[in-house]
């Protein structure tokens, strides 16, 4: 795990520098050539499904990538990711979660024998997570005979009182477990076809899995079998499908 941690620290440092560089470039471009800045942002938006999402227009989200709220939120996500302990081939962190009935449990309770367990971390205010919910639901339908699925609701990616997008779900960042359960209930209404639990307010599970703002994992027999990239770029249900097809 030592080498994996070193790689994690170095990659996070590189990502932080990249984020700052991109931010400064966009701010400068916006000042001298707003049309060119928009072109760059739309290209980025295509990679994270924002331009494909019918819920949003460019004006709802594009300019927020040049805001201090973006820097603050993205930096916080990177800082928390340094506590990541879930690595492919290693032990899956058995961290605590809370059911929708307010019962404390843990990740391992959802592992059944040698069946794979797909974990999907996310929140309603994360547009790519919600945009790909139907794709995730199709995974549940197609592979429920060989695998189990669990959605873990975590801190809001784009809370109304944080890095907010217009026309998004109106949910403030959670100040209590009741807030988080209430937000998760919004997701439950979309019928994800599998159990939904929430992370504790310490965000311990989110941190150990490096899950902000969204992420996919496959666990089996207490080990990490598959670890998707960090969202929004790395949240890819198609990769999970390919992985499960090999073991079906």
From Swiss-Prot:
Enzyme Commission number, as recorded: 1.21.99.4
Reaction catalysis annotation: 3,3',5-triiodo-L-thyronine + iodide + A + H(+) = L-thyroxine + AH2
GO biological process, one term: thyroid hormone metabolic process
Membrane topology designation: Single-pass membrane protein
Pfam families: T4_deiodinase
InterPro entries given in the database record: Iodothyronine_deiodinase, Iodothyronine_deiodinase_AS, Iodothyronine_deiodinase_I/III, Thioredoxin-like_sf
Subcellular location: Endoplasmic reticulum membrane
Residues annotated as catalytic: 126
Alphabetized GO MF terms: thyroxine 5'-deiodinase activity
Keywords: Endoplasmic reticulum, Membrane, Oxidoreductase, Selenocysteine, Thyroid hormones biosynthesis, Transmembrane, Transmembrane helix
Transmembrane segment boundaries: 7-29
GO cellular component: endoplasmic reticulum membrane
Family: Belongs to the iodothyronine deiodinase family.
Function description: Responsible for the deiodination of T4 (3,5,3',5'-tetraiodothyronine) into T3 (3,5,3'-triiodothyronine) and of T3 into T2 (3,3'-diiodothyronine).
Protein name per its UniProtKB record: Type I iodothyronine deiodinase
UniProt source species: Oreochromis niloticus (Nile tilapia)
């Amino acid at each position: 795990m030592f080498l994996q941690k070193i790689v994690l620290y170095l990659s996070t440092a590189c990502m932080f520098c990249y984020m700052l560089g991109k931010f400064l470039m966009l701010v400068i471009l916006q000042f001298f050539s707003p049309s060119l800045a928009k072109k760059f942002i739309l290209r980025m938006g295509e990679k994270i499904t924002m331009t494909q999402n019918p819920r949003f227009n460019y004006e709802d989200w594009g300019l927020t990538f040049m805001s201090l709220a973006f820097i603050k939120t993205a930096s916080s996500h990177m800082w928390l990711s340094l506590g990541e302990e879930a690595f492919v081939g290693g032990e899956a962190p058995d961290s605590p979660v809370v059911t929708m009935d307010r019962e404390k449990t843990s990740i391992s309770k959802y592992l059944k024998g040698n069946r794979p367990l797909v974990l999907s971390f996310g929140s309603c205010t994360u547009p790519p997570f919600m945009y790909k919910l139907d794709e995730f639901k199709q995974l549940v339908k197609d592979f429920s005979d060989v695998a189990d699925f669990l959605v873990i609701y975590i801190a809001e990616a784009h809370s109304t009182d944080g890095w907010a997008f217009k026309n998004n779900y109106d949910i403030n960042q959670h100040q209590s477990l009741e807030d988080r359960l209430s937000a998760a209930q919004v997701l439950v209404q979309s019928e994800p076809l599998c159990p939904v639990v929430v992370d504790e307010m310490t965000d311990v599970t989110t941190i150990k899995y490096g899950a902000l703002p969204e992420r996919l994992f496959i666990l089996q027999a207490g080990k990490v079998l598959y670890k998707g990239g960090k969202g929004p770029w790395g949240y890819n249900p198609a990769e999970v499908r390919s992985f499960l097809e090999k073991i079906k």
